[in-house]
Amino acid sequence: MTSYRNGPDAKGLFGRFGGQYVAETLMPLILDLAREYEKAKDDPAFQEELAYFQRDYVGRPSPLYFAERLTEHCGGAKIYLKREELNHTGAHKINNCIGQILLARRMGKKRIIAETGAGMHGVATATVAARFGLQCVIYMGTTDIDRQQANVFRMKLLGAEVIPVTAGTGTLKDAMNEALRDWVTNVDSTFYLIGTVAGPHPYPAMVRDFQAVIGKETREQLAEKEGRLPDSLVACIGGGSNAMGLFHPFLDDAGVQIVGVEAAGHGIDTGKHAASLNGGVPGVLHGNRTFLLQDADGQIIDAHSISAGLDYPGIGPEHAWLHDTGRVEYTSITDDEALEAFHTCCRLEGIIPALESSHALAEVFKRAPSLPKEHIMVVNLSGRGDKDMQTVMHHMQQESKA
């Protein structure tokens, strides 16, 4: 059987997706980074230090929790939550940041830059930069700054400089463009800490590997609790790192159904969504070839989602490839469906999920009722919802007016 876990190839390609579409000035740096990462991967001292920080700083392993009340509510499949929201900084983002900051230090870089949408990757990057005493600059779109004030303040508290990006719609895509510009001009001193499984090779593979701790733990924890593999896995997808982290260790287990959930915003047919696989076409953005939201002239269309973390017009190249091969099923959930799932999880489990994770929960609530009681579903609760209070309050006020 051909493995789904061998990618990317030497050129950083997953089938027809991925690659290294960057400015010539960045090419030596990218190749150097790929070499350093391969070395670090095989270095027991690096892995040991990574394991130490994952355990004592991040708080891993994160629990795999049987959601008894949600299971009863759906009346079908047995629902488990992988509790990534309990990590230090409140989401899965820190898994990748700890890995990359150790790599940056190993490469002698003194300045860290990153892009952020919901602010969670920005907070996680500022956190690890503070811990290792490195200068930190975060690029964030003005639209996202407005809807994520608390996270902006957190980043500043942690010593990071937050640079507002006014270009475009002032969201994640624009922040990433600015970060790439910065990197080109400060190649020698600067390490670009990308927050998702996108960007030029080696980033998609590197971020996936640092996030794969999610899926590895899930395998072990479920073996302990149920003595077997799950029947299905569900995770939300913006760029797709929390999903890739859960999915990757299970890709070669044919009996495990895998479902990625994109943001359908107001609905795919309205054009106001962030579902690159369900509503996009292949193209090149931010250093890699993948599915993108584009108009007839190939211009990138602005994505929309109630959740700032899913509001990206592309998707990681490995997801694009898994979609091509049919190994993973990709669906989408609207803003309203995600909000409903958010409220259900709050009321029934006493857990306030991020709006991103609520998209995955909504998909679970659609599927679980028609599945047998012995069917085991694992959903990645990728982050906590503290950052989304303003958005949810605003929505509830709008609804009460209507």
From Swiss-Prot:
The terms describing its cellular component in GO are: cytoplasm
**Needs which cofactor?**
pyridoxal 5'-phosphate
* A Pfam family reported for this protein in Swiss-Prot or TrEMBL: PALP
Q: Which pathway does this polypeptide act in?
A: Amino-acid biosynthesis; L-tryptophan biosynthesis; L-tryptophan from chorismate: step 5/5
| Alphabetical UniProt keywords | Amino-acid biosynthesis, Aromatic amino acid biosynthesis, Lyase, Pyridoxal phosphate, Tryptophan biosynthesis
Q: So what does this thing catalyse?
A: (1S,2R)-1-C-(indol-3-yl)glycerol 3-phosphate + L-serine = D-glyceraldehyde 3-phosphate + L-tryptophan + H2O
CDD domains in UniProt: Trp-synth_B
Q: Which InterPro entries match?
A: Trp_synth_b_CS (IPR006653), Trp_synth_beta (IPR006654), Trp_synth_beta/beta-like (IPR023026), TrpB-like_PALP (IPR001926), TrpB-like_PALP_sf (IPR036052)
Q: Does the keyword Amino-acid biosynthesis apply?
A: yes
Query: Which superkingdom does the taxonomy of this entry point to?
Result: Bacteria
Task: Give the protein's biological function.
Answer: The beta subunit is responsible for the synthesis of L-tryptophan from indole and L-serine.
Under the heading HAMAP family, the entry gives: Trp_synth_beta
Quaternary structure, per UniProt, is: Tetramer of two alpha and two beta chains.
Q: What name is this protein filed under?
A: Tryptophan synthase beta chain
UniProt organism field: Pseudomonas aeruginosa (strain ATCC 15692 / DSM 22644 / CIP 104116 / JCM 14847 / LMG 12228 / 1C / PRS 101 / PAO1)
